[in-house]
């Protein structure tokens, strides 16, 4: 059994090495198709310098792209770590305090500090005067006094309110 296992492992190792070589050859063929070697024969000094400048510019652009990609991936990893810490509860959340804002401050916060809006929110409200309320209460009081007169029972009510009560 042991010999069979070693033979299988040796065969698998040879196949892995062969696959690795095939991958390397495929990579070389692919890169050769993407970036053909520059033809430098028959070029003058000025043309060679121009070619070098062009290649240098391409390399600089690729470096910037790589640097930006690295920064983005680093920031994404940091944000993910912070999310995990918040979800895990190890990150201390600050205690939030209630802040009272006036209407002007709220509008400034919503519209931005550039817009100065002095809106008076009480302008649309109806104003009630105390005089009107007092007149209504007087009218109600007068009406209650006249209930007996309007009901037509003035005389009969007096009989019941008399000291003798009308009986007897």
Swiss-Prot record:
InterPro entries: Troponin (IPR001978), Troponin_I (IPR050875), Troponin_sf (IPR038077)
A GO BP annotation: skeletal muscle contraction
Chain spans, region Disordered: 128-168
Start-end of Basic and acidic residues biased regions: 128-147
UniProtKB keywords: Actin-binding, Muscle protein
SUPFAM superfamilies reported in the protein's UniProt record: Troponin coil-coiled subunits (SSF90250)
Molecular function per GO: actin binding
A single Gene Ontology CC term: troponin complex
Pfam families for this protein: Troponin
This protein's record includes keyword Oxidoreductase: no
Keyword Metal-binding attached: no
The organism's place on the tree of life at top rank: Eukaryota
PANTHER family: TROPONIN I, TROPONIN I, CARDIAC MUSCLE
Biological function: Troponin I is the inhibitory subunit of troponin, the thin filament regulatory complex which confers calcium-sensitivity to striated muscle actomyosin ATPase activity.
Subunit structure, interactors included: Binds to actin and tropomyosin.
Protein family: Belongs to the troponin I family.
UniProt protein name: Troponin I, cardiac muscle
Organism, scientific name: Gallus gallus
The organism's taxonomic lineage, starting at the top: Eukaryota, Metazoa, Chordata, Craniata, Vertebrata
């Amino acid at each position: 059994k042991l010999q069979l296992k070693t033979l299988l492992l040796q065969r698998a190792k040879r196949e892995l090495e062969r696959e690795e070589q095939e991958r390397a050859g495929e990579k070389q063929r692919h890169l050769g198709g993407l970036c053909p070697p520059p033809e430098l024969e028959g070029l003058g000094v000025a043309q060679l310098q121009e070619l070098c400048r062009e290649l240098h510019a391409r390399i600089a652009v690729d470096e910037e792209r790589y640097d930006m990609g690295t920064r983005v991936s680093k920031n994404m990893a940091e944000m993910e770590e912070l999310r995990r810490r918040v979800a895990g509860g190890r990150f201390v959340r600050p205690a939030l305090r209630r802040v009272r804002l006036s209407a002007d401050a709220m509008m400034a916060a919503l519209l931005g500090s550039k817009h100065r809006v002095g809106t008076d929110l009480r302008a649309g409200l109806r104003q009630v005067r105390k005089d009107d309320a007092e007149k209504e209460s007087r009218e109600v009081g007068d009406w209650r006094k006249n209930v007996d007169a309007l009901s037509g029972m003035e005389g009969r009510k007096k009989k019941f309110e008399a000291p003798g009560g009308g009986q007897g």
